[in-house]
Amino acid sequence: MPASTSGYADVSPSLGLHRLAVLTAAVTFVLIFVGGLVTSTGSALAVPDWPLAFGHLIPKLVDGVRFEYGHRVVAAVVVILTLVLAIWTCFAERRKWVRNTALAAFALIIVQAVLGGITVLLQLPLAIAVAHAATAQAFFCVTVAFAMFTNPRFGAHRSISRNDESPRLATLTTITTAVIYVQILIGAVMRHLGAGLAIPDFPLSYGHLVPPFDSIFVDVNFAHRCGALIVTVFAIWTVAHVMRFHSQESQLRRPALGLLALLIVQVTLGAFTIWSGRAVLPTTAHVAVGAAVLATSLALTIRAYVLGGLASAAEAARVPAPFSGAIERKITA
């Protein structure tokens, strides 16, 4: 396939690589769920040593050991998948930036594994535990993006509508994704600080809109609630923008509506987490769906940039020859 003006159509020829990338992203999502399960059940220190478990490869699977050891097993699977993905990509992928993405993913999962080990060995220090959670979400985003990059249809869209709102959508989705990531970090601080029920009622806070700020636990909990409100505003703004200016483009409409649906589920799970006294299932699901919200927003962001770039390339192709080179250099810069 000839390279497009934007460079997006020079896709990987390997469907197998794409399928492995999708599998890696899916198993990473499972890893995040299991990690949330470990925290929700208080099992993070059920196995006190690392990388072994009670001095063995396979410990006796009782009580919280099941969750913590299961978390380690899934993590090992993700490391192996990512290693295979990186090696395969280096040999099969033409695009250097995609190869670099695969290598970055492998480096990130190694950092994540080491942070997990340090978290156990140092008995859950807050900073390391939060860094572990933050890296997990970042790695999940990389796997989702990589799965999109290796899709043989990535960027291969023929009908692209270009209007003045395209750059604004790319900017808006980027901000929305960043806000969601920050909100997840605040949630990680709250979880590892043990402040999930510092404000025991919802939607009010101790019966008021604003709670008494008498402890760091209340401060962090209320910050997470305020963050949820900010995320909701940006997500709705993003979806409304897509539906108003890009409703005919299914590559944007579908993830936008998916983002809205997941946001509704996430807010509902957050409420049930409080109402249930942090029951394991809604609390863990809240962590997992939060990751899904982030990944969906990222997918929408990538598509906004890609489709906008393709539209720019299409415009450049229609420009008379004396000007086309200058526009092409501007697009690819």
Task: Give names to the regions the model predicted.
Residues M1-A333:
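Polytopic transmembrane helical bundles with strong interfacial aromatic enrichment
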